[in-house]
Regions:
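Extended, subdomain-level signal for the structured scaffold at the beginning of enzyme domains
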Residues: 1-135, 146-237
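Conserved, well-structured core segments that form or line functional sites
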Residues: 138
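Catalytic nucleophile serine of serine hydrolases
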Residues: 142-144
């Protein structure tokens, strides 16, 4: 049985450029959809957060505008999260996870990762070790790729340099109303760091696979990103 550790942000606020705190956390759909798909496929799932803190759901992720104006979809996500109970509210500490303990690491999005996962002191070493093992899979969706920025090798080079990848685009950040006050933009940082960033039209489902690295553009890409991971599992794990 393949195993996956799903990493969710432990942040409940995102500090904006003007120093104001914006309520945030992990994005519901970007956790629920992959978790359900992984569970249905029989994967052994572990949930982790920085410090093992109880993660906060980004309140915006239940907004109808980000859920195809489908109230039923929002209710389904809320019910799914409630059913997980202590599995979600008492996660493993990211600091305790090891690369040899899992086949897959999946970084869940929401603006929370911009606050904590992007600067996590130990997660990067796990990501590097897994990227360097062709039998392991590293995946991230939406703002989850912010966590990939920690994956520096001992010589200082970024482990995702020259890899094709995606994540929340500048256009999407602008349309969501955060670009002007964001401390930095994910697309810009991925490009500057050396990634071969690619995207589709805003809000279109889009997943990119480059070897054992799988990334999804935004919340509507959660399903196709999880599907791409499961397809890789069938041939690598």
């Amino acid at each position: 049985m393949a195993s996956v550790v799903m990493v969710v942000s432990g942040a409940s606020v995102w500090t904006m450029k003007n120093a104001t705190p914006h309520p945030t956390g992990f994005w519901s759909e970007e956790f629920v959809t992959p978790h359900r798909k992984f569970a249905d496929a029989g994967l052994k799932i572990t949930i982790a957060s920085p410090g093992g803190v109880t993660p906060t759901v980004d309140p915006l992720s239940f907004n109808l505008a980000y859920n195809s104006n489908d109230a039923g979809k929002v209710k389904e996500q809320q019910d799914y999260l409630k059913r997980l109970g202590s599995v979600l509210t008492s996660p493993t500490r990211v600091e305790d996870i090891k690369a040899d303990g899992f086949d897959i690491i999946f970084l869940v999005g929401g603006h929370g990762p911009m606050q904590d996962m992007a600067v996590h002191p130990t997660m990067g070493a796990v990501i590097v070790a897994m990227l360097d093992n062709p039998k392991k899979i590293v995946a991230a969706v939406c703002h989850g790729p912010a966590g990939l920025l920690t994956a520096a090798r001992s010589d200082g080079t970024w482990a995702c340099k020259d890899r094709q990848l995606t994540g929340f685009s500048n256009d999407e950040e602008s349309q969501a109303g955060f670009a002007g006050n964001a401390p930095w933009l994910l697309e810009d940082r991925l490009r500057i760091s050396g990634g071969r960033y690619v995207s589709k039209a805003p809000w279109a489902p889009h997943a990119v696979v480059d070897g054992n690295l799988v990334t999804g553009q935004q919340n509507y890409s959660a399903g196709v990103t999880a599907d791409a991971v499961l397809k890789l599992v069938s041939v690598t794990v």
